[in-house]
From Swiss-Prot:
Swiss-Prot/TrEMBL catalytic activity: malonyl-[ACP] + S-adenosyl-L-methionine = malonyl-[ACP] methyl ester + S-adenosyl-L-homocysteine
CDD domains, per the entry: AdoMet_MTases (cd02440)
Statement: the UniProt record of this protein carries the keyword Signal: no
Superkingdom, taxonomy of origin: Bacteria
A Pfam family per the record: Methyltransf_11
Protein name per the record: Malonyl-[acyl-carrier protein] O-methyltransferase
E.C. no: 2.1.1.197
Keyword Isomerase carried by entry: no
GO BP term, example: biotin biosynthetic process
Pathway: Cofactor biosynthesis; biotin biosynthesis
Molecular-function GO term, any one: malonyl-CoA methyltransferase activity
Length: 255
């Protein structure tokens, strides 16, 4: 399957999220809301061993641990994993890539991965890895962003300089196809956040590490003049600057 993310730069992703580790939780209200919904979709599963794949600062690792799970926290960004470890969010910590999980087959009862797989070069490979490390009878819970996310920002940048400067996300049809090999459920949600100005909007993205990374570029776009041009081009509704997220939540059942 062709991915929208074929040129994703994993080193740039790890570096950006490591730098954002200190400010991530304060900026990550959407991430918390999405993760809490995803957690609720699997919280009744009786399995004990849980992998938090792309754990970030360990916010959800901690929530799962408090629910009695034995949590292994995995992240590509050393800075994020350091914060999770300092917070004693999990029982075990692994530095690694979700597309090459450093675990044996059938090691986990639950694999949880919230707003992570959009950074993968190959979504089917990432899901196959999570399936591999999950025991029969277990579940894989994931959420991701689909095409149409950050649409307003991309459209505004296009007016400024002819380039979109936002990450490419897979169409929902490709996400569905990636899940089709498994017994699964997939639900979607459109969430729009509003900001008082474009600078606040851009800082919210930088605060969670979600700058433009799919071609290895991060930041470097924002002189005062370019910010003014972006704000002038950005759609404003009743004094607010909207940013849309097209979300997909998946539950895959390990046979």
């Amino acid at each position: 399957m062709t991915s929208a993310n074929d040129t994703v730069n994993k080193q740039a992703v790890a570096s950006a999220f490591s730098r954002a580790a200190g400010s991530y939780d304060a900026a990550a209200a959407l991430q918390r809301d999405v993760g809490e919904r995803l957690l609720g979709m699997g919280s009744s599963h009786p399995g004990e061993q849980l992998l938090d794949a792309g754990c970030g600062t360990g916010y959800f690792s901690r929530m799962w641990r408090e629910r009695g799970k034995r949590v292994t926290a995995l992240d590509l960004a050393p800075g994020m994993l350091d914060v999770a470890r300092q917070r004693q969010a999990a029982h075990h910590y692994l530095l690694g890539d979700i597309e090459q999980v450093p675990l044996p087959d059938a090691a986990m009862d639950i694999c949880f991965s919230s707003l992570v797989v959009q950074w993968c070069s190959d979504l089917p490979a990432a899901l196959a890895e999570l399936y591999r490390v999950t025991r029969p009878g277990g579940v894989i819970l994931f959420s991701t962003l689909a095409a149409g996310s950050l649409q307003e920002l991309g459209d505004a940048w296009q007016q400024v300089d002819g380039e979109r400067h936002v990450n490419a996300f897979l169409p929902l049809t490709q996400i569905r196809t990636a899940c089709a090999a498994y017994r699964h459920e997939l639900v979607t949600e459109l969430r729009t956040l509003n900001y008082p100005d474009v600078m606040t909007l851009m800082r919210s993205l930088k605060g969670i590490g979600a700058t433009h990374l799919h071609q290895g570029r991060e930041g470097g776009l924002m002189s005062r003049g370019r910010l003014a041009a972006l704000q002038a081009a950005y759609p404003c509704r009743q004094g607010q600057f909207p940013l849309s997220y097209h979300l997909a939540y998946g539950v895959i059942y390990r046979e």
